[in-house]
């Protein structure tokens, strides 16, 4: 199986493209969804509360606020949760070893050095205006957190430069499908 990492800035369209690929029958893995599942585990909640006692109670909103305003807390949480995420990613790859392609959306792929787990990386990108417009439609939108996320992520330009492929999601659906089909055709040549 070719393992393809999908990354990009906040609200760039990564999940939309991952879900589109899943609808087309490709095997997919979403880091954000996986982490949300991990957070349901009481042992993991307890571990996070021991690691970050200032939280007092396990609350996703509190965690977000803390990690985007406290570099040390973010680093502690990442050091705790990333090995668990890597286990789940490796399990996904093993379970789908006979598939031609496996696509995994990892928002902080380069920042967390997850690129080593992939044969190819795709960066999904669009203009800042479109990203902000998309972000504001989310129920959890907070402009301060949006700006903090931008600060800790590599720039969109850096992610595009590092990637093997780039998809501009700031286009109409027909053009987006064409780009995804071109990506698949390119990957087919590399199997």
From Swiss-Prot:
Broad class of where this protein is predominantly found: cytoplasm
Catalytic activity entry: 3'-dephospho-CoA + ATP = ADP + CoA + H(+)
Record: residues binding ATP: 11-16
One Gene Ontology cellular component: cytoplasm
Gene Ontology BP term (one): coenzyme A biosynthetic process
Gene3D superfamilies hit by this protein: P-loop containing nucleotide triphosphate hydrolases
Molecular function (Gene Ontology), one example: dephospho-CoA kinase activity
Localization annotation: Cytoplasm
Keyword terms: ATP-binding, Coenzyme A biosynthesis, Cytoplasm, Kinase, Nucleotide-binding, Transferase
InterPro entries: Depp_CoAkinase, P-loop_NTPase
UniProt pathway: Cofactor biosynthesis; coenzyme A biosynthesis; CoA from (R)-pantothenate: step 5/5
EC number annotated for this UniProt entry: 2.7.1.24
General function of this protein: Catalyzes the phosphorylation of the 3'-hydroxyl group of dephosphocoenzyme A to form coenzyme A.
Entry's family note: Belongs to the CoaE family.
Official protein name in the record: Dephospho-CoA kinase
Gene name per UniProt: coaE
């Amino acid at each position: 199986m070719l393992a393809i990492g999908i990354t990009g800035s906040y609200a760039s369209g990564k999940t939309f493209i991952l879900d589109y690929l899943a609808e087309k029958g490709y095997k997919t893995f979403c880091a954000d969804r996986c982490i949300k599942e991990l957070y349901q585990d009481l042992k993991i909640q307890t571990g996070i509360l021991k690691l970050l006692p200032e939280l007092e109670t396990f609350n996703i909103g509190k965690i977000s606020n803390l990690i985007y305003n406290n570099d040390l807390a973010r680093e502690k949480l990442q050091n705790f949760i990333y090995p668990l995420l890597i286990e789940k990613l490796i399990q996904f790859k093993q379970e789908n070893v006979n598939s031609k392609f496996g696509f995994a959306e990892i928002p902080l792929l380069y920042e967390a050095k997850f690129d080593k787990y992939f044969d190819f990386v795709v960066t999904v990108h669009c203009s800042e205006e479109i990203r902000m417009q998309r972000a504001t439609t989310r129920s959890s939108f907070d402009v301060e957190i949006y700006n903090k996320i931008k600060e800790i992520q590599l720039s969109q330009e850096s992610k595009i430069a590092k990637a093997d492929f780039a998809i501009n999601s700031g286009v109409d659906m027909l053009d987006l499908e064409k780009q995804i089909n071109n990506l698949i055709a390119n990957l087919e040549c590399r199997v």
